[in-house]
Amino acid sequence: MILKGCLLYPLCSPRNKQRCARLWKIAYGGLLKIVTGSLLTFYVVLCLDGGMVLMRKQVPSRFMYPKEWQHLTMFILLTLNGCVDFMSKNVLPQRCVGLEKGTLVLIIYELLLLMVSHVKDSEGVELHVYSLLILVVFLLLLVLTAELWAPNMCHLQLMETFLILMMGSWLMQAGFILYRPVSGYPWQDDDISDIMFVTTFFCWHVMINASFLLGIYGFSSFWYHCFRPSLKLTGPKEAPYYASTPGPLYKLLQEVEQSEKEDQALLLPKSSP
């Protein structure tokens, strides 16, 4: 009876399976990009007291807040990238990976152009920090461009993951260097040791991110080689329990059901007045 109940009432109903499948197909990465880009966009717009004014009213007219407008453009691009990912995975009838990759490459191209012009009035430590960031963005652009013609090369995908990790971690490090130094004292542009340590920190980021990726790859490889063979061996043994074709277990269940019906038929005359 226990086996029969397990077969007739499975743990996951078809409705729950369909719901889990729909949740699994949601582009969470795209939603995260949309939410993050939107929040940062609102932050840039609201952080200025006078608002995002494009040009001042005095004569001669000049553009105002050039860096803030560049930040706003970057965050809007991030939001648009998330919208494209979400539409490709959840709105279109069939996912278009080429559209996602092409949009990402175009956005990285624009990001590189914005970064190059972003450092025009920078110097010292700030210029060095942004130069290293531009180097990472440029290498990422090359890898993404190569992926358009070779989308299934695992080496390019690994390099893409590493460079995205580098860009994210170095952006956080740049925030601490330029705006909130850990020591509490601002970095000195005229001190050569500060500029040298910026490069040292960048090399540390390279080693940490590479070790992080290597650890994930090593753990995944270990898990695959240790547990994958056992799954392959136990898979065919469990298959007959879920098959609909008649087998020994199916015949046993029929015999149990028939015996229960006979017992009930014998009990009915005794219980009747």
Curated annotation (Swiss-Prot):
It comes from the Eukaryota. This is Transmembrane epididymal protein 1. It is found in: Membrane. The gene is TEDDM1. Its main location: membrane. GO terms for cellular component: membrane. The chain crosses the membrane at residues 34-54, 72-92, 96-116, 129-149, 158-178, 195-215. It is a multi-pass membrane protein. Keywords: Membrane, Transmembrane, Transmembrane helix. Belongs to the TMEM45 family.
